[in-house]
Amino acid sequence: MTDQKHPLLAGLQDATPLANWSSTELSNAAVEIRDVLCNLLATRTAHFASNLGVVELCLALHSEFDFRTDRLIWDTGHQVYPHKLVTGRYDRFETIRTAGGLMGYPNPHESVYDLFMTGHAGCSVSTAVGLRSGDILMDQKDRRTVAVIGDGAFPCGVVFEALNNAGELGDDLTIILNDNKMSICHRTGSVAQYLDRLRGNPFYTGLKHEVTKLLDRVPMFGDPAERLLAQMKEGVKAGLLGGMLFEELGIRYIGPIDGHDIPLMQKYLRLCKETPGPVLLHVVTEKGHGYKPAAEDPVFFHTPPAFEDRGGTPVTRGSDGRPPYTTHARDAIGEAMKRDSRVTVITAAMCQGNKLEPVREQFPERFFDVGICESHAVAFAAGQCKTGMRPIVDIYSTFLQRSYDQIFQEVALQDLPVVFMMDRAGLTAPDGPTHHGVYDIGYMRLFPNLVLMAPGYAEELSMMLDKALTLDHPSGIRYPKASALEATHTPAPIEIGKAEWIREGTDGTIVAYGAMLEQAIAAAEQLEGELEIGVVNARFVKPIDAEMVHKTLSDGRFVVTLEEGTRVGGFGSAFLESAVDQRLDTRAVHRLALPDEFVLHGDRSQLLDQSTLSAQKIAEVCREAASEVGSQVGI
């Protein structure tokens, strides 16, 4: 990136100059932004197509509002790259999604333009309603509030909770519905169909063009001409379409309009500012706009691998050749569905991320993508399960948090054998704290009836799923985004609540839960000739193997527990609870886990090392532990 190549962006310390830029300058800035995005994708995987689609919308917003004092919330936040580029972060943009660099999501620690650190979908309207309410109470009524939410996130239940509240309060608020007909994959559901009807209704499309012509003739808003225009729109729209969903909720609906026409959006944004009460502006955009490969395949280019050229050819990178756990999970699900016609799979808009496309194609009648509606996904699974079906909820660990109450009431309390496949459990590297799946161990093991397990290597994943589908209780299987370790031994059969001993040791034992088994084995191998370290594949955190806990602590040798999850309430805590229940001496237990803080973004191996979870750091802890034990016995 050079100043000569991107002079408009390089000259921005904040977004205030955009208010005085001409249409030509704004259009040129859009070209610069897309060039920067393409340059970035030559170096790393990042959110791409969604950012390409909001370039003009971002420029229009910053040219009409001053978001140093006004409020702007980007729902989910993966589409904030243009926003970062025009708010003074151009010079640091090449650090995005790298350790110590810019986050790939909004981050208040970076800029006053970012209000919330986000990454999950659906809450923008709620926080915007709250911001507006608070500003009114704090006598800050001149501050304007804008929420930008995509049509993929719009069906979230919390969105309609917010609209319900916004309509009742009646406070001034602008909601931008960024409609690109996509979530990560193609969106699903009746809300999507409703938005399609709004986009395609020939009567309203004609009305839109007439309103556009009138807008062109009205230089300023807030006068009788504007009010007349608004009344005309309301009357004609009501006559053509009847009572519309948003209008019936007390939300003024405007649109749909072209989300790539900056002057047009500027005029409509001014209309929104002058319209009293909550307003929803329906903006139609194209995901991947301005870059042909992304526009033609927005699913692949949502977060594509790094480019080899501007044609979108992926860079060939070195690989350990091992498929990720996600691939093994998909294959195990497919095999289970072949064997048993009662097995279904439910995902919440993560078909691509969970690599479920082959399952969807082979078993379309038993595949359910419910959209970004995790609470519904879990309750829906409970309903299926009650009829005798065997549903699998295939979901990212961090997104399962959104359905906590449904796990409690609809599944655990009913003791229904729903299977939760918790993908992306552990560190998700460059996505940062909103996407790390580090809390599921703690919050899932709280519930009675739930059986919780984690594979230490690839072969175990299918074994665990097969076992889970035989249970009469709910169960969860956690696994990371990482490539899967392949067993070098014949795996022991899966027995509920039983660990697997990988190797015996005379000096101490490492007890690893899940994918941390790979680091445990590597650490033990590093110490060969120095210490004889046993390695245990815990397999279960609930019920934990009490006999294994007793055996590892019975001879006074040290024990190191490993988990790719938070230290509080995790596997190490479960290990100590079992030890205390058995009245065992726990002084030689060392818990290695992620710290009790929000882990930022970076390379997974780097983050593991920082958290004392790399093989090298684990080996160092073992040396220290052995020394402590030796000094205690007088050696």
Swiss-Prot record:
Cellular-component GO terms for this entry: cytosol
Pfam families in the record: DXP_synthase_N, Transket_pyr, Transketolase_C
SUPFAM superfamilies in the cross-refs: Thiamin diphosphate-binding fold (THDP-binding), TK C-terminal domain-like
Residues that span the membrane, as ranges: none
Key words of the record: Isoprene biosynthesis, Magnesium, Metal-binding, Thiamine biosynthesis, Thiamine pyrophosphate, Transferase
InterPro entries linked to this entry: Dxylulose-5-P_synthase (IPR005477), THDP-binding (IPR029061), Transketo_C/PFOR_II (IPR009014), Transketolase-like_Pyr-bd (IPR005475), Transketolase_C (IPR033248)
Signal peptide: none
Sequence segments annotated as region (Disordered): 305-325
Residues annotated to bind Mg(2+): 151, 180
Class in the EC hierarchy, top level: transferase
UniProt binding sites for thiamine diphosphate: 78, 119-121, 152-153, 180, 291, 374
GO BP, sorted A to Z: 1-deoxy-D-xylulose 5-phosphate biosynthetic process; isopentenyl diphosphate biosynthetic process, methylerythritol 4-phosphate pathway; terpenoid biosynthetic process; thiamine biosynthetic process
Reaction it catalyzes: D-glyceraldehyde 3-phosphate + pyruvate + H(+) = 1-deoxy-D-xylulose 5-phosphate + CO2
Pathway assigned to this chain's UniProt record: Metabolic intermediate biosynthesis; 1-deoxy-D-xylulose 5-phosphate biosynthesis; 1-deoxy-D-xylulose 5-phosphate from D-glyceraldehyde 3-phosphate and pyruvate: step 1/1
Keyword Transferase set for record: yes
Cofactor note: Binds 1 Mg(2+) ion per subunit.
Purpose of the protein: Catalyzes the acyloin condensation reaction between C atoms 2 and 3 of pyruvate and glyceraldehyde 3-phosphate to yield 1-deoxy-D-xylulose-5-phosphate (DXP).
Assembly information from the UniProt record: Homodimer.
Protein name: 1-deoxy-D-xylulose-5-phosphate synthase
Organism: Rhodopirellula baltica (strain DSM 10527 / NCIMB 13988 / SH1)
